[in-house]
Amino acid sequence: MCMFINIGGGRSIDVIYIMECKEEKNYYNAAMRQINGDSLCLSTYQYLKRNEEWIGRYENFLKGKRSLPLLYDPFFKKIFNPVERRDRLSELVSCLLGQKVTVLEVFPNEDSQFLGVMIIMDMVVMMADGSIANIEIQKISYDFPAERISCYSADLVLRQYKMITGKNQGRKHEASMNGSSKPSYKDMRNVHTIILFEDSNKSLISDMDKALYFHVGKTRFNTGVKIELLQDFVLVSLDTFRKYRYSDIREGRTEITDYDYDSSQYNDELVSEKMKRDRLKFLSLFVAETPQEIDRLIEIFPDLESVRQDINEYLERPGEVLSMFSEALRILDRNTAELMVDRMKDEMEALKVQKDELKAQNEELKSSSEEKDAEIARLKKLLEEQNK
């Protein structure tokens, strides 16, 4: 916010702006004093300095030049804390799923065989109707997205089944939702896999229109039989959203388009206009990079003011936010390393196959050469006999 004070002669000075710049600089200086005076913070800071991009993000946040990277696990789970910010998290899940939901609980990642592997953020939540949703964010466009998504969704189904059969500690009271002593499959509810891709691979570029960014998937049968399977999928290409939609929203053009909401995929009676607008609001928040961008979004979506306040609170807690940055970097480093290992394994397997093929070709050539040598020897012998 800037305030111009006229001092005569048509001139003005931006007093508030100068004060804010000074305050931003003081946040950085105060943070550096705290870091240098704490051996643990200093060690964490040195770790972060090994990555030029991430130390830049941290310092620029303190200087008021960058916002927090909300699409990383430590930051997301603070801003969308399921206890302190349950309403905000429920709003997010509601607008992504296209139905009103209330988040009841968040499950730990370690309960899963698949979740938390090669991803930036994952959160498994249960809604008021008993259905389960997994929210995941991928920073890197990983290989085999269809296979990974299928595994994540299957894991959610298994989690819910274990709850119903009473295998999970603390959930035996949910052994049967219909009053029977024996769990029933009809107690199962939908599971929703929500994945936000920061860097979409080519499989997420629609042949219909490259600007389509919100992909909704369900299993349907060619005969039209009414068998509703449990697994639903929502895949959001944030880079596509930023490229083709975000600039319009920043200009105030927030009318809902077919790119934002495909009515054929939802029950319109369950989807409010607020949910549609919330979808634009949260996706815009996720791709915003600077405080100035967030300020502009607040003019369009005033209820983002509470998010800005939560973000700004971390300017007063540089040690805590430093730990969050270092944790996010460790997750990214681990995921990148695992991705590289997987790709190296694939390359080694491909080289092995190539080696085997070359070996087979060599054997064929050797066999062919031996046959030719034998034929030459036979012809020589025949020629010698004819010359006698």
Label each residue range with its predicted role.
Residues 2-388:
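Elongated, amphipathic alpha-helical interaction scaffolds
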